[in-house]
């Protein structure tokens, strides 16, 4: 008997392929590889080491993420996409060659007043319509001049913004955001970045000096269309094993609440993964998994540690056989569409109980 529990298999070959695809889509742009949230659940150290030679910078959300990269040998620049949270972080940022976004007056004043050993590279974040982080359009000039006047700031100031609807392929609001960004930064020295994954795929005019691939770097589409259509390869394959096969009678229910009742004699397979591993509890009956070259449907309610599938009466599957929950054989975008849980959330909500296997 040889059964493996829930395992996320992470492919460096797929990662590198996706970076090359991204470069082909935006050949004139430099790349900030977004590896926040443990590289979208893929393992930040493995991912960053795998692509460091292919990218120009890394993007993270927290200083702790940046310092983890530094302590694990990553030497490329790192950008704090939300900026710094505490005044005391600034000397650490300077010493470790970490760049920071500035998006509010509190950060600006802290930066001006800080005692740092060397100037810090700053990206001024502009709110062009996301209305989350960023300085107002009418305040860009003030912030820009204040940053230029500070000895604590590297004179090469960058400009950054973020689309709110780049995944809508025909959206005038995205065009408006780009126009606002270009107008706000015209006649100002400094490199510009507004395109994340949606912008890279669907809005070529937004590529500018830097692009910030996130979800597409991991071979997942920002819309519920399989990423393979954009020449992207899934980096993660989520697998588990059949741990039991049960003969099941017509008219008998399966699982908690008896919400599914078989209309025929069949075989039920029990798979060692559940919501305790991060697989969605509310996923509906009929959602496919991939087993021995075919799709079979989940039946009954997903429980904490297991789910059940209808193998069919004539199934030849065996205990220990590998089951794929998503990956190249079964696009995560399809699971996202069925479950109502976006792919970003599916991959980042996997729990520590899921083993990670780095391959290639």
UniProtKB/Swiss-Prot annotation:
Pfam families: Ala_racemase_C, Ala_racemase_N. Substrate binds at residues 132, 304. The active site is at 36 (proton acceptor), 256 (proton acceptor). Coiled coil: none annotated. Gene3D superfamilies: Alanine racemase (3.20.20.10), Lyase, Ornithine Decarboxylase, Chain A, domain 1 (2.40.37.10). GO terms for biological process: D-alanine biosynthetic process. GO terms for molecular function: alanine racemase activity; pyridoxal phosphate binding. One of its GO terms (cellular component) is cytosol. Pathway: Amino-acid biosynthesis; D-alanine biosynthesis; D-alanine from L-alanine: step 1/1. Its EC number is 5.1.1.1. Its cofactor is pyridoxal 5'-phosphate. InterPro entries: Ala_racemase, Ala_racemase/Decarboxylase_C, Ala_racemase_C, Ala_racemase_N, Ala_racemase_pyridoxalP-BS, PLP-binding_barrel. It comes from the Bacteria. PROSITE patterns: ALANINE_RACEMASE. Keywords: Isomerase, Pyridoxal phosphate. The modification N6-(pyridoxal phosphate)lysine is found at residue 36. It catalyses: L-alanine = D-alanine. It is an enzyme of class 5 (isomerase). NCBIfam families: alr. Catalyzes the interconversion of L-alanine and D-alanine. May also act on other amino acids. Belongs to the alanine racemase family. This is Alanine racemase.
């Amino acid at each position: 008997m040889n059964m493996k529990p829930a395992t996320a298999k992470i492919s460096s070959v797929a990662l590198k392929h996706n970076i090359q695809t991204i470069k082909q889509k935006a050949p004139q742009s430099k790349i900030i590889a977004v590896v926040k949230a443990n590289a979208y659940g893929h393992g930040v150290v493995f991912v960053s080491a795998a692509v460091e030679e292919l990218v120009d910078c890394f993007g993270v959300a927290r200083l702790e993420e940046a310092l983890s990269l530094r302590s694990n040998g990553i030497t490329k620049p790192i950008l704090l996409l939300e900026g710094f949270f505490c005044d005391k972080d600034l000397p650490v940022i300077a010493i470790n060659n970490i760049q920071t976004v500035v998006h509010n007056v509190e950060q600006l004043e802290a930066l001006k007043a800080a005692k740092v050993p060397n100037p810090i590279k700053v990206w001024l974040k502009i709110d062009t319509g996301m209305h989350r982080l960023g300085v107002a359009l009418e305040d860009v000039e003030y912030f820009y001049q204040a940053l230029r006047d500070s000895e604590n700031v590297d004179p090469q100031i960058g400009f950054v913004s973020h689309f709110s609807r780049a995944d809508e392929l025909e959206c005038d609001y995205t065009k408006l955001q780009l126009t606002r960004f270009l107008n706000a930064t015209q006649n100002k020295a400094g490199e510009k970045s507004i395109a994340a994954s949606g912008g890279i795929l669907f809005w070529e005019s937004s590529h500018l000096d830097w692009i910030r691939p996130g979800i597409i770097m991991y071979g997942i589409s920002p819309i519920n269309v399989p990423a393979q259509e954009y020449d992207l390869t899934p980096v993660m394959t989520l697998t588990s094993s059949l741990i039991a096969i049960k003969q099941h009678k017509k008219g008998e229910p399966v699982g908690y609440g008896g919400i599914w009742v078989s209309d025929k004699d069949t075989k039920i397979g029990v798979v060692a993964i559940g919501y305790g591993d991060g697989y969605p509890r509310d996923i509906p009956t009929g959602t496919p998994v991939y087993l021995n070259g075919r799709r079979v449907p989940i039946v009954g309610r997903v429980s904490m540690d297991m789910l059940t599938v209808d193998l069919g009466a004539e199934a030849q599957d065996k205990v220990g056989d590998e089951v794929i929950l998503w990956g190249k054989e079964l696009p995560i975008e399809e699971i996202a569409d069925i479950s109502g849980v976006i792919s970003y959330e599916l991959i980042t909500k996997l729990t520590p109980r899921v083993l990670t296997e780095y391959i290639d």
